[in-house]
Curated annotation (Swiss-Prot):
Gene name of the record: IBD2
Organism: Candida glabrata (strain ATCC 2001 / BCRC 20586 / JCM 3761 / NBRC 0622 / NRRL Y-65 / CBS 138) (Yeast)
Signal peptide (residue range): none
Domain of life, source organism: Eukaryota
Function noted in UniProt: Part of a checkpoint which monitors spindle integrity and prevents premature exit from mitosis.
Any Gene Ontology biological process: mitotic spindle assembly checkpoint signaling
Compartments where located: Cytoplasm, Cytoskeleton, Spindle pole
Stated family: Belongs to the IBD2 family.
Name of the protein described by the UniProt record: Protein IBD2
Keywords of the record: Cell cycle, Cell division, Cytoplasm, Cytoskeleton, Mitosis
A GO cellular component annotation in the UniProt record: cytoplasm
Protein backbone atom coordinates (compact mmCIF):
# COMPACT_ATOMS: atom_id res chain seq x y z
CA UNK A 1 0.00 0.00 0.00
CA UNK A 2 1.39 3.38 -0.96
CA UNK A 3 1.90 6.11 1.58
CA UNK A 4 -0.61 8.47 0.00
CA UNK A 5 -3.33 5.89 0.49
CA UNK A 6 -2.91 6.13 4.22
CA UNK A 7 -4.98 9.30 4.33
CA UNK A 8 -8.25 7.49 3.64
CA UNK A 9 -10.45 5.61 6.03
CA UNK A 10 -11.65 2.53 4.12
CA UNK A 11 -11.98 -1.02 5.40
CA UNK A 12 -12.75 -4.17 3.42
CA UNK A 13 -12.97 -7.88 4.26
CA UNK A 14 -12.64 -10.66 1.69
CA UNK A 15 -12.94 -14.44 2.20
CA UNK A 16 -11.57 -16.80 -0.46
CA UNK A 17 -11.86 -20.60 -0.41
CA UNK A 18 -10.76 -23.17 -3.01
CA UNK A 19 -13.55 -25.56 -2.00
CA UNK A 20 -16.39 -23.16 -2.74
CA UNK A 21 -18.05 -20.23 -1.06
CA UNK A 22 -18.02 -19.86 2.69
CA UNK A 23 -21.25 -19.09 4.50
CA UNK A 24 -21.74 -15.36 4.96
CA UNK A 25 -23.24 -15.87 8.39
CA UNK A 26 -20.25 -17.86 9.53
CA UNK A 27 -17.93 -15.21 8.18
CA UNK A 28 -19.74 -12.45 10.03
CA UNK A 29 -20.16 -14.32 13.27
CA UNK A 30 -16.78 -15.96 13.49
CA UNK A 31 -14.11 -14.67 11.17
CA UNK A 32 -14.88 -10.96 11.12
CA UNK A 33 -15.72 -10.89 14.79
CA UNK A 34 -12.39 -12.45 15.72
CA UNK A 35 -10.31 -10.41 13.31
CA UNK A 36 -11.95 -7.16 14.36
CA UNK A 37 -11.16 -7.88 17.97
CA UNK A 38 -7.59 -8.83 17.12
CA UNK A 39 -6.90 -5.80 14.99
CA UNK A 40 -8.68 -3.23 17.16
CA UNK A 41 -5.62 -2.77 19.35
CA UNK A 42 -3.35 -2.20 16.40
CA UNK A 43 -5.75 0.32 14.87
CA UNK A 44 -5.86 2.27 18.10
CA UNK A 45 -2.16 2.07 18.91
CA UNK A 46 -0.56 2.56 15.52
CA UNK A 47 -2.59 4.74 13.13
CA UNK A 48 -1.45 4.49 9.54
CA UNK A 49 -0.55 0.79 9.70
CA UNK A 50 -0.36 -1.08 6.41
CA UNK A 51 -3.07 -3.57 5.40
CA UNK A 52 -2.88 -7.10 6.82
CA UNK A 53 -3.24 -10.25 4.76
CA UNK A 54 -4.22 -13.39 6.67
CA UNK A 55 -3.80 -16.82 5.10
CA UNK A 56 -5.18 -19.92 6.81
CA UNK A 57 -3.43 -22.99 5.40
CA UNK A 58 -3.98 -26.71 5.68
CA UNK A 59 -2.34 -28.28 8.73
CA UNK A 60 -0.27 -30.80 6.79
CA UNK A 61 2.21 -28.11 5.85
CA UNK A 62 5.19 -27.34 7.94
CA UNK A 63 4.80 -24.85 10.74
CA UNK A 64 7.07 -21.88 10.64
CA UNK A 65 8.33 -19.67 13.38
CA UNK A 66 7.45 -15.99 13.70
CA UNK A 67 9.75 -13.74 11.77
CA UNK A 68 8.85 -10.20 12.78
CA UNK A 69 11.72 -8.52 11.00
CA UNK A 70 11.62 -10.62 7.84
CA UNK A 71 10.69 -9.28 4.46
CA UNK A 72 8.55 -12.28 3.55
CA UNK A 73 5.17 -13.16 4.98
CA UNK A 74 5.23 -13.80 8.69
CA UNK A 75 3.68 -16.99 10.02
CA UNK A 76 1.97 -17.45 13.33
CA UNK A 77 1.79 -20.98 14.70
CA UNK A 78 -1.63 -22.01 16.01
CA UNK A 79 -0.94 -25.44 17.44
CA UNK A 80 -1.67 -28.23 14.96
CA UNK A 81 -4.87 -26.74 13.55
CA UNK A 82 -3.55 -24.40 10.89
CA UNK A 83 -0.96 -21.90 9.92
CA UNK A 84 -1.71 -18.21 10.18
CA UNK A 85 0.08 -15.82 7.82
CA UNK A 86 0.34 -12.09 8.30
CA UNK A 87 1.80 -9.58 5.88
CA UNK A 88 4.29 -6.87 6.67
CA UNK A 89 3.28 -4.00 8.85
CA UNK A 90 3.14 -5.82 12.17
CA UNK A 91 4.92 -3.93 14.91
CA UNK A 92 5.44 -6.52 17.64
CA UNK A 93 4.48 -10.03 18.64
CA UNK A 94 1.73 -8.88 21.01
CA UNK A 95 -0.05 -7.15 18.14
CA UNK A 96 0.08 -10.12 15.78
CA UNK A 97 -2.62 -12.36 17.20
CA UNK A 98 -4.33 -13.63 20.30
CA UNK A 99 -3.54 -17.28 19.77
CA UNK A 100 -6.05 -18.76 22.19
CA UNK A 101 -9.01 -16.79 20.86
CA UNK A 102 -8.51 -17.53 17.19
CA UNK A 103 -7.46 -21.13 17.89
CA UNK A 104 -10.71 -21.79 19.75
CA UNK A 105 -12.74 -20.35 16.90
CA UNK A 106 -10.97 -22.45 14.28
CA UNK A 107 -11.19 -25.59 16.42
CA UNK A 108 -14.91 -25.31 17.06
CA UNK A 109 -15.94 -24.40 13.51
CA UNK A 110 -13.28 -26.00 11.33
CA UNK A 111 -15.67 -28.35 9.56
CA UNK A 112 -18.26 -25.66 8.98
CA UNK A 113 -15.67 -23.27 7.57
CA UNK A 114 -14.57 -25.92 5.02
CA UNK A 115 -10.85 -25.51 5.67
CA UNK A 116 -9.98 -28.87 4.07
CA UNK A 117 -8.71 -27.48 0.80
CA UNK A 118 -5.22 -26.53 -0.19
CA UNK A 119 -5.55 -22.98 1.02
CA UNK A 120 -8.17 -20.50 2.15
CA UNK A 121 -7.36 -16.90 2.81
CA UNK A 122 -9.01 -14.02 4.58
CA UNK A 123 -8.02 -10.53 3.52
CA UNK A 124 -8.65 -7.88 6.11
CA UNK A 125 -7.67 -4.72 4.28
CA UNK A 126 -7.86 -1.44 6.08
CA UNK A 127 -6.45 2.01 5.67
CA UNK A 128 -6.26 4.54 8.42
CA UNK A 129 -6.24 8.27 8.27
CA UNK A 130 -3.93 10.12 10.57
CA UNK A 131 -6.21 12.04 12.87
CA UNK A 132 -5.53 15.74 12.68
CA UNK A 133 -6.05 18.13 15.51
CA UNK A 134 -9.80 18.54 15.46
CA UNK A 135 -10.05 21.85 17.23
CA UNK A 136 -7.49 23.60 15.02
CA UNK A 137 -8.77 22.20 11.74
CA UNK A 138 -12.42 22.89 12.54
CA UNK A 139 -11.57 26.38 13.73
CA UNK A 140 -9.64 27.03 10.53
CA UNK A 141 -12.58 25.89 8.40
CA UNK A 142 -14.99 28.12 10.30
CA UNK A 143 -12.63 31.06 9.93
CA UNK A 144 -12.42 30.51 6.18
CA UNK A 145 -16.19 30.29 5.88
CA UNK A 146 -16.71 33.53 7.78
CA UNK A 147 -13.94 35.29 5.91
CA UNK A 148 -15.54 34.35 2.59
CA UNK A 149 -18.72 36.29 3.41
CA UNK A 150 -17.08 39.40 4.86
CA UNK A 151 -16.48 42.29 2.45
CA UNK A 152 -12.82 42.86 3.38
CA UNK A 153 -11.98 39.52 4.96
CA UNK A 154 -10.75 39.14 8.50
CA UNK A 155 -7.63 41.20 8.05
CA UNK A 156 -4.41 40.79 10.03
CA UNK A 157 -6.00 40.62 13.45
CA UNK A 158 -7.85 37.42 12.71
CA UNK A 159 -8.46 36.22 16.25
CA UNK A 160 -9.92 39.42 17.59
CA UNK A 161 -12.02 40.11 14.56
CA UNK A 162 -13.29 36.55 14.41
CA UNK A 163 -14.43 36.82 18.00
CA UNK A 164 -16.20 40.06 17.15
CA UNK A 165 -17.91 38.37 14.24
CA UNK A 166 -19.14 35.56 16.43
CA UNK A 167 -20.50 38.14 18.87
CA UNK A 168 -22.38 39.92 16.09
CA UNK A 169 -20.28 43.08 16.15
CA UNK A 170 -18.68 42.83 12.71
CA UNK A 171 -21.69 42.02 10.59
CA UNK A 172 -22.35 45.59 9.46
CA UNK A 173 -22.01 44.78 5.79
CA UNK A 174 -22.88 47.86 3.77
CA UNK A 175 -23.31 48.24 0.05
CA UNK A 176 -21.26 50.89 -1.68
CA UNK A 177 -23.39 53.60 -3.29
CA UNK A 178 -21.93 56.12 -5.68
CA UNK A 179 -22.50 59.76 -4.90
CA UNK A 180 -24.34 60.34 -8.16
CA UNK A 181 -26.73 57.48 -7.41
CA UNK A 182 -27.42 58.88 -3.95
CA UNK A 183 -28.18 62.37 -5.32
CA UNK A 184 -30.46 60.93 -7.98
CA UNK A 185 -32.30 58.88 -5.37
CA UNK A 186 -32.79 61.91 -3.11
CA UNK A 187 -34.12 63.98 -6.01
CA UNK A 188 -36.52 61.20 -6.89
CA UNK A 189 -37.85 61.06 -3.32
CA UNK A 190 -38.23 64.83 -3.09
CA UNK A 191 -40.01 64.94 -6.44
CA UNK A 192 -42.39 62.22 -5.31
CA UNK A 193 -43.20 64.09 -2.12
CA UNK A 194 -43.82 67.32 -4.03
CA UNK A 195 -46.13 65.58 -6.47
CA UNK A 196 -48.04 63.86 -3.68
CA UNK A 197 -48.39 67.11 -1.77
CA UNK A 198 -49.70 68.93 -4.85
CA UNK A 199 -52.23 66.21 -5.53
CA UNK A 200 -53.34 66.33 -1.94
CA UNK A 201 -53.98 70.09 -2.04
CA UNK A 202 -55.91 69.94 -5.30
CA UNK A 203 -58.00 67.03 -4.14
CA UNK A 204 -58.80 68.71 -0.88
CA UNK A 205 -59.65 72.11 -2.27
CA UNK A 206 -62.10 70.59 -4.72
CA UNK A 207 -64.09 69.24 -1.77
CA UNK A 208 -66.79 71.83 -0.99
CA UNK A 209 -67.26 73.05 2.53
CA UNK A 210 -70.81 73.05 3.87
CA UNK A 211 -72.40 76.31 4.79
CA UNK A 212 -73.80 74.89 7.96
CA UNK A 213 -72.16 72.36 10.25
CA UNK A 214 -75.42 71.34 11.86
CA UNK A 215 -77.44 68.31 10.97
CA UNK A 216 -80.43 68.95 8.78
CA UNK A 217 -83.40 67.27 10.32
CA UNK A 218 -85.56 65.97 7.54
CA UNK A 219 -87.34 63.11 9.22
CA UNK A 220 -87.63 60.05 7.03
CA UNK A 221 -89.30 57.27 9.00
CA UNK A 222 -87.79 58.66 12.18
CA UNK A 223 -84.20 58.75 10.80
CA UNK A 224 -81.90 61.60 9.91
CA UNK A 225 -81.36 62.41 6.26
CA UNK A 226 -77.94 63.80 5.34
CA UNK A 227 -78.11 65.67 2.07
CA UNK A 228 -74.61 67.03 2.61
CA UNK A 229 -71.41 65.36 3.71
CA UNK A 230 -71.11 64.53 7.36
CA UNK A 231 -70.11 67.78 9.16
CA UNK A 232 -67.47 65.96 11.16
CA UNK A 233 -65.32 65.69 8.06
CA UNK A 234 -64.90 69.46 7.80
CA UNK A 235 -63.21 72.14 9.80
CA UNK A 236 -62.72 75.83 9.42
CA UNK A 237 -60.72 77.32 6.57
CA UNK A 238 -57.45 77.59 8.53
CA UNK A 239 -57.31 73.99 9.69
CA UNK A 240 -58.61 72.26 6.60
CA UNK A 241 -55.19 71.06 5.46
CA UNK A 242 -54.85 69.02 8.62
CA UNK A 243 -58.31 67.57 8.26
CA UNK A 244 -57.40 64.43 6.27
CA UNK A 245 -54.85 63.42 8.89
CA UNK A 246 -57.34 63.93 11.70
CA UNK A 247 -60.40 63.30 9.64
CA UNK A 248 -62.58 62.44 12.59
CA UNK A 249 -60.75 64.35 15.27
CA UNK A 250 -63.77 66.33 16.53
CA UNK A 251 -66.16 63.46 16.96
CA UNK A 252 -65.80 63.76 20.68
CA UNK A 253 -67.11 67.36 20.44
CA UNK A 254 -70.21 66.55 18.51
CA UNK A 255 -73.55 66.03 20.21
CA UNK A 256 -76.16 64.23 18.21
CA UNK A 257 -79.76 65.40 18.30
CA UNK A 258 -82.20 63.91 20.72
CA UNK A 259 -82.87 60.39 19.63
CA UNK A 260 -86.18 59.47 18.15
CA UNK A 261 -88.27 56.55 19.34
CA UNK A 262 -86.67 53.29 18.34
CA UNK A 263 -87.71 51.97 14.99
CA UNK A 264 -86.50 49.27 12.66
CA UNK A 265 -83.13 49.93 11.03
CA UNK A 266 -83.39 51.85 7.79
CA UNK A 267 -80.44 50.92 5.60
CA UNK A 268 -81.93 52.73 2.63
CA UNK A 269 -80.77 55.98 4.23
CA UNK A 270 -77.22 55.07 3.20
CA UNK A 271 -78.29 54.51 -0.39
CA UNK A 272 -79.80 57.98 -0.62
CA UNK A 273 -76.66 59.56 0.82
CA UNK A 274 -74.61 60.97 -2.04
CA UNK A 275 -71.45 61.79 -0.11
CA UNK A 276 -69.49 59.56 2.28
CA UNK A 277 -70.20 59.91 5.96
CA UNK A 278 -68.35 58.76 9.02
CA UNK A 279 -68.96 55.45 10.70
CA UNK A 280 -70.75 57.05 13.62
CA UNK A 281 -73.14 58.97 11.39
CA UNK A 282 -73.84 55.86 9.35
CA UNK A 283 -74.92 54.16 12.53
CA UNK A 284 -77.01 57.18 13.48
CA UNK A 285 -78.69 57.30 10.07
CA UNK A 286 -79.56 53.61 10.09
CA UNK A 287 -80.60 53.07 13.70
CA UNK A 288 -81.79 56.57 14.62
CA UNK A 289 -79.56 56.90 17.67
CA UNK A 290 -75.88 57.66 18.20
CA UNK A 291 -73.46 54.78 18.82
CA UNK A 292 -72.63 55.59 22.42
CA UNK A 293 -70.24 52.71 22.98
CA UNK A 294 -68.39 53.39 19.75
CA UNK A 295 -67.99 57.06 20.66
CA UNK A 296 -66.84 56.12 24.13
CA UNK A 297 -64.20 53.80 22.70
CA UNK A 298 -63.09 56.42 20.20
CA UNK A 299 -62.76 59.10 22.86
CA UNK A 300 -60.71 56.73 24.98
CA UNK A 301 -58.16 56.17 22.21
CA UNK A 302 -58.39 59.35 20.14
CA UNK A 303 -60.01 61.84 22.49
CA UNK A 304 -58.86 65.13 23.95
CA UNK A 305 -55.54 63.77 25.16
CA UNK A 306 -54.58 62.44 21.74
CA UNK A 307 -55.91 64.83 19.13
CA UNK A 308 -56.04 68.62 18.61
CA UNK A 309 -59.09 70.50 19.85
CA UNK A 310 -61.32 72.89 18.01
CA UNK A 311 -61.46 76.42 19.30
CA UNK A 312 -64.91 77.08 17.92
CA UNK A 313 -67.71 74.69 18.69
CA UNK A 314 -70.44 76.34 16.67
CA UNK A 315 -71.09 72.97 15.06
CA UNK A 316 -72.44 71.60 18.33
CA UNK A 317 -76.16 71.04 18.13
CA UNK A 318 -77.90 72.81 20.95
Amino acid sequence: MSSNNQNTNNTSIELISENGPISLNLMMEEGVKALTRILSNQLNDTPGTQPMHFIIKKNDKDNKAIDINGDDEEVVELGNESNYHMSDGVQNEAEIILNDQLNDILKNHESQLRLDGEEAEIIFDYETQGTVDGSDSIGEKITQMIESVLPNGLGPNTTGKLQAVLNGKELNITEEIHKSDRIEEEEHIEGGLTTAEGNFEVEFETEPLPEDHKHTEENIDGHENYNDCCPHHHNNQDNRRRAPKYKNYNYHDYEYTVQHPKTEPNFSALINQKKPVCLFCEYYMVFGEPPKNMIKWYNMHYGYNHLPQRNDRHHRNR
